[in-house]
Structures are given as structure tokens and as C-alpha cells.
């Protein structure tokens, strides 16, 4: 899958879209096919190394996403494949797929677009 990967801190234009492995699910997680990812001010600072939180390299930024659940992990009961959701990912959201704990999900109303949800 493709993801926006940060291998070093610096301006946005030094970072690249790369092929990475699809995330594996842990118990309590779902796999989301990302349709939209939010870009917040902290995200811009994080990739430049200007935020108090500095993740280890390489990392995939993206703390908020909207998309559809494509896979359900063990122990997840409140969601199903195909559900439209909003998730607070912490990181990893700027990818085609992201694994997140179901406890971070909210159902996205049909009246909202994925872009509005992210």
C-alpha cells in the first residue's frame, strides 16, 4: 500500500509517498480503507521536528481519518466491514490503510462526506 512516510524531519517537500506493508490487526482493532485524512497544524510541525512529540523514524503522520472498515479484528463487536467511520489514529493516517482500535472510532453519518469527516 502507499503511504506518506517521514524518514527525517524537514519541510513537507522532502517527504515521499512510498510502498509500505499493510498493517496487521491486533485484538480490538479494525482496518480502515482511508478515504480522507486531516492535516492539522500539529501534523505540519511534527514532520518538521518542531513539535514537542517526535516520533521515531520512519513514521506515517496523520491523526484523523475517515474511511470504510475493510477488516475486523478479534473482539470488535460494535462495527462491521463496510461501516463508514471517523477515527482518531494518533499517527499512520496518511496511508491507504490504517489499523486502529475500535474504541477510537465514530460512525460517519451518511449525510457527511469523507472529507468533512476527516
Question: What is the meaning of each model-derived region?
Answer:
Residues 1-2:
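Extreme N-terminal starter segment of soluble prokaryotic enzymes
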Residues 6-14:
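Extracellular beta-rich ligand/substrate-recognition surface
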Residues 42-48:
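Cytochrome P450 core scaffold surrounding the K-helix E-X-X-R motif
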Residues 98-112:
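Short, compositionally biased
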Amino acid at each position: 500500500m502507499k503511504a506518506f512516510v517521514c524518514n527525517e524531519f524537514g519541510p513537507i517537500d522532502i517527504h515521499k509517498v512510498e510502498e509500505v506493508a499493510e498493517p496487521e490487526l491486533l485484538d480490538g482493532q479494525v482496518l480502515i480503507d482511508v478515504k480522507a485524512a486531516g492535516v492539522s497544524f500539529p501534523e505540519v510541525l511534527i514532520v518538521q521536528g518542531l513539535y514537542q512529540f517526535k516520533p521515531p523514524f520512519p513514521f506515517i503522520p496523520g491523526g484523523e481519518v475517515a474511511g470504510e472498515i475493510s477488516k475486523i479484528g478479534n473482539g470488535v463487536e460494535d462495527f462491521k466491514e463496510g461501516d463508514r467511520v471517523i477515527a482518531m489514529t494518533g499517527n499512520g493516517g496518511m496511508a491507504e490503510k490504517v489499523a486502529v482500535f475500535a474504541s477510537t472510532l465514530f460512525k460517519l453519518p451518511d449525510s457527511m462526506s469523507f472529507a468533512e469527516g476527516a
